[in-house]
């Protein structure tokens, strides 16, 4: 069966030696351990304070990505709740080796977002297909014309019109908010994508703060807790904006009638955790 898969080589090899497995495990455990994380965070905070810089959170928005639309709905509340400068970037989709079946990924992002939105108190129109590219272009030109503060205010409205397929509403938003030219749009996308690459990531719906990445609304509670620990929570003691949903196993038990299919990626650290 191994011949069906392409050997990636390097750290992504699918058949490391026992010694390499052991070494990799030790290295990853050391890098990701609580002590190492705390040390890195303390260093980042010390550098921030010494430079006199505010708490700067960068957000990377991929217009036709469902997860980005969910994230856009919390930008306003997030920027108001925490004492931060929220800088918003427009980006292109994953490229190169990071772009595995991009059309399927986009379609599944809409499917996933529709099914999880309610659990976070958010909205996502049911959408069986990727949004129309004409509307994606229009939505992109609207957002490219906004600075970060304007982006925070309007991104969710633009996204809702896009994912609802409401061209008339998008046109109205374009008239009221303005649109970037094609040249300006490309420049904005190039700039945001380059910044994301500089910070060593490839995806949309990403938040970056203090040398760490936080993906979408379902990981935002990690960033909220970190900011609160640094005294940046303007409503200390209040519930988080995006707390981790409780897992309710329910009373039903397996009776042997259901089959769970798992599709692991042997390159993925998530597979190792599972």
Named regions from a protein language model:
Residues 33-52:
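Short alpha-helical hairpin
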Residues 62-63, 100-101, 179-180, 265:
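Short, contiguous strand/loop micro-motifs
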Residues 63, 69-162, 274:
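Structural alpha/beta surface segment adjacent to cysteine/selenocysteine redox centers
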Residues 66, 93-94, 132, 212-214, ...:
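Short, solvent-exposed loop/turn segments at secondary-structure junctions
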Residues 19:
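Short linear clamp-binding motif
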Residues 43, 59, 87:
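Nucleic-acid-interacting cores, centered on viral/eukaryotic replication and modification enzymes
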Residues 3-13, 23-31, 37, 69-78, ...:
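C-terminal cap of thioredoxin/glutaredoxin-like
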Residues 47-77, 91-92, 254-274:
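Local sequence-structure signature of Cys/Sec-based thiol-disulfide redox active-site neighborhoods
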């Amino acid at each position: 069966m191994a011949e069906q898969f392409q050997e990636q080589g390097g750290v992504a090899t699918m058949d490391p030696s026992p010694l390499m497995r052991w070494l990799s495990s030790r290295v990853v455990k050391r890098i990701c351990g609580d002590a190492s994380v705390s040390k890195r965070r303390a260093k980042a905070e010390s550098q921030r304070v010494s430079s006199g810089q505010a708490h700067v959170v960068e957000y990377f928005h991929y217009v036709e990505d469902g997860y980005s639309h969910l994230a856009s709905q919390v930008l306003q509340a997030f920027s108001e709740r925490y004492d931060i400068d929220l800088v918003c970037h427009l980006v292109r989709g994953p490229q190169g080796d990071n772009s595995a079946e991009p059309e399927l990924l986009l379609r599944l992002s809409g499917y996933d977002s529709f099914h999880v939105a309610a659990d976070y108190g958010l909205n996502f129109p049911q959408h069986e297909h990727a949004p129309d590219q004409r509307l994606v272009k229009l939505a992109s030109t609207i957002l490219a014309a906004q600075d970060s503060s304007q982006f925070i205010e309007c991104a969710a409205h633009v996204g809702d019109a896009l994912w609802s397929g409401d061209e008339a509403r998008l046109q109205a938003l374009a008239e009221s908010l303005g649109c970037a030219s094609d040249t300006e749009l490309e420049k904005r996308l190039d700039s945001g994508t380059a910044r994301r690459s500089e910070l060593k990531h490839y995806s949309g719906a990403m938040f970056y703060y203090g040398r760490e990445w936080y993906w979408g609304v379902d990981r935002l509670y990690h960033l909220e807790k970190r900011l609160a620990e640094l005294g940046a929570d303007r409503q200390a003691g209040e519930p988080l904006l995006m707390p981790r949903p409780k897992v309710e196993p329910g009373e039903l038990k397996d009776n042997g009638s259901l089959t769970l299919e798992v599709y692991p990626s042997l390159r993925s650290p998530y597979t190792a955790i599972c």
